[in-house]
Amino acid sequence: MPNIKSAIKRTKTNNERRAHNATIKSAMRTAMKQVETFVSNNEADKAKAALSAAAKKIDKAAKKGLVHKNTAARYKSNLAKKVNGLSA
């Protein structure tokens, strides 16, 4: 446990940020799983709508530095391939 006042404040801030970042990453993962569910159930319209929502959450996570921009691009690309495979 830190003794210096500024270190105590930083610890508190870090814990708050970690919790906030975890909720954003969790929402991103949930959105991705929702797309996967619609794809596995062959629901093309719902999958496309969920894909745009998931892409938005993935981009937000990348913008905040929670995932690397190339990782975000890979996530979106893989989801898009699966959704586009439904309509083909």
Swiss-Prot record:
Entry's Gene Ontology molecular function annotations: small ribosomal subunit rRNA binding; structural constituent of ribosome
Any one Gene Ontology BP term: translation
KW Lipoprotein (keyword) present: no
Record's keyword terms, sorted: Ribonucleoprotein, Ribosomal protein, RNA-binding, rRNA-binding
Family that this chain belongs to: Belongs to the bacterial ribosomal protein bS20 family.
Function: Binds directly to 16S ribosomal RNA.
Protein name: Small ribosomal subunit protein bS20
The species this protein was found in: Bacillus licheniformis (strain ATCC 14580 / DSM 13 / JCM 2505 / CCUG 7422 / NBRC 12200 / NCIMB 9375 / NCTC 10341 / NRRL NRS-1264 / Gibson 46)
